[in-house]
Amino acid sequence: MLLEFTKMHGLGNDFVVLDLISQRAYLDTTTIQRMADRHFGIGFDQLLIVEPPDYPNVDFKYRIFNADGSEVEQCGNGVRCFARFVHERQLTKKTKIKVQTKAGIVEPELGPNGWVRVNMGYPKFMPHEIPFVTEEFEALYTLELANEQSLKIDVVNMGNPHAVTIVPDVLTADVATMGPQVESHVRFPQRVNAGFMQIVDEKHIRLRVFERGVGETLACGTGACAAAVSGMRRGLLANEVEVELAGGKLQIAWQEGDVVWMTGPTANVYEGRLDLRYFQS
């Protein structure tokens, strides 16, 4: 069985996008893992699936699978690519759409030259909303790591869980060691995305993210939102900031009590057809 797909990326955070409105397929965990293999498959950070919505006032259903085959609630870079994909594939003529995710409704809006602005919804901070295990709510939490190390973290849910820590320099931060420990820490029962943020000034941060189920990626849209919101609510950042990631830059805006806005680019890489029998054999 041949499936048409599109390879896209948002700041190097790369995706395979499948239209499962015009075509049909069943993809189990093993199949997705094989597709994600960068040597024997296509290779991607996440698989994005376009499906019909479950509700009449929504345009599309958006499903996201990590490279390890796990389904997740949200992907910020992915939703920008999703919006461009459905418009260019003529699945909709709208430039502003409502998209159903496991975390709720997001509203991307197409701009010029492949840029997309997205209403990412309201950030959540309560421990049970992350979820994060703690005896009481605090502004910052101490997370114990191996070898008697610890990190001061903030926790934010942007449709998916994030732990944010401030570092002096993202280039020298030991993301490879600390990232996996934070991601799978026992206090995060659903695992977590680990963000390492350097504050350059009140309108500019640098960020590295070790993503749950993927590892460190070149960019993470929800991670950029979580880091910016964390700094803003602590009075360390202005209400609009530029987030510099390895793959490029995002603009994040937020006012206390309001939704988070993310603006950034998208790119089409190539289109192709995959033989599903190869990945399921």
Swiss-Prot record:
It is an enzyme of class 5 (isomerase). Substrate binds at N13, Q46, N66, G76, N77, N160, N193, E211, R212, G221, T222. GO terms for molecular function: diaminopimelate epimerase activity. GO terms for biological process: lysine biosynthetic process via diaminopimelate. The active site is at C75, C220. It is found in: Cytoplasm. Pfam families: DAP_epimerase. HAMAP family: DAP_epimerase (MF_00197). Homodimer. This is Diaminopimelate epimerase. It comes from Acinetobacter baylyi (strain ATCC 33305 / BD413 / ADP1).
